[in-house]
Amino acid sequence: SHNPAKYNGYKAYGPDGCQLGLEAADYVLSIMNKVDIFDDVKTTDFENAVKEGKIEYIGDDIINEYLDCVMACRVAPNTDVGALKVIYTPLHGSGNKPVRKILSKIGVTNVTVVPEQEKPNGNFPTAPYPNPEIRQAFECALKLAKDIKPDLLLATDPDCDRVGIAIPDKDEYKLFSGNDVGALLLDFVLSRRKANGTLPKDPIAVKTIVSTELCRKIADNYGCKLIDVLTGFKFIGEQITELEKKGEENRYVFGFEESYGYLGGTYVRDKDAVIASMLICEMVAFYKAEGKSLIDVLDGLYKKYGYYLCSQKSFTCEGESGMNKIKGIMTELRTNPPTEINGHKVVKRDDYDTSVSYDTVNGVENKITLPKSNVLCYYMEDGSSLIVRPSGTEPKIKMYLGSVGKTMESSEKELSLLADVGTKLLGF
């Protein structure tokens, strides 16, 4: 995925193309646990497996059908994208062919691929941490940009489900966060589909609980219902599947998570950097034709809805003592929940492990209908928020911070203070 070369693993998907949900994953794991990995594993050679139909090659017909599905999700098909100049890096991964193919199909032909990162290489020699969320992954592309001076830099992670972007900002290049791009894409998709007359009745967008609340304001403006789900794109995929069961999948317009995952269609049930790259190119070209950059557009959203800013901090707690420390932090927060954070009264706290949302102002408890998860959320009277959860894959406890202000300066100050207060609250 987007981890260093030393990491190993796999993702398990169901017949609907969505990662296995909690119940299905537990069932599969129970079957796996019954298998003796030394005696019960059946083996065969590759060619025999192909002959027996146990392994199937994905043909061009499937690939072309996939590309057609992505193309059908364009929201500004009349936008002239031909003049767009793009630098792209697949970060030694699988994105090179599909991303370049889809960009070519919509007319983006001036694409320069970072040469030293073009071919797949699981050792990731030029990007030890091939994650488009961090600036280091863009270093080769940024060097190339000094000569080419593109309108847009795109970087997809090795399995091509996340995409990061950078655009010119005076003499430098500004990298956008996943929340920035998620808000921009949601507004772009909703505004263009409304203008095109293709916005469905009672549209639905989906985001994870740790993603920016700016999207709620944007969705409300277009009469779009915004659904919150637990962290992990499989929960966004599950929402599409539930809509499909009711014959209402056309209501889904967009889904995203702050960790650079986006999906603008229902043809798959996971984040997809191919469609995201297409929509981003459309968006940059559309606003360029209006004389705007994404910096201008994002600032316009802030001025209209409020300066919603987000950040996160992780604290590493290794070994058994670290696990106990994380457990102790979560227990203490549940036993003695804060009533005030950063000088602002906590008006609501959500505990996804007990499935209880508590309105501290009115003293009312409401049931959380999402699956149980070890997550605690605190919402303050000024609109700021603090969310705490242990990492599911690393020996870390994570803290997600959100602030909102009438100016960038006031929101940035609030976010910085909130980070300090949150760090002390967790005991670090």
Give the location of each predicted region.
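Short Gly/Thr/Asp-enriched flexible loops that form oxyanion-binding sites at enzyme active sites
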Residues: 6-13, 99, 161-180, 215-218
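Gly/Ser/Thr-enriched, mixed-charge loops and adjacent short helices
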Residues: 8-145
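Catalytic-loop motifs flanking and including active-site residues across diverse enzymes
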Residues: 24, 95, 178-185, 211-215, ...
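Phosphate/diphosphate-binding loops
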Residues: 1-36, 131-155, 160, 183-189, ...
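Gly/Ser/Thr-rich loops at beta-strand to alpha-helix junctions
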Residues: 3, 90-96, 160-162, 210-213, ...
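Cysteine protease catalytic core and zymogen-processing segment of caspase-like enzymes
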Residues: 20-21, 167-193
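Phosphate-binding and adjacent anionic-ligand microenvironments
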Residues: 146, 150-152, 156, 172, ...
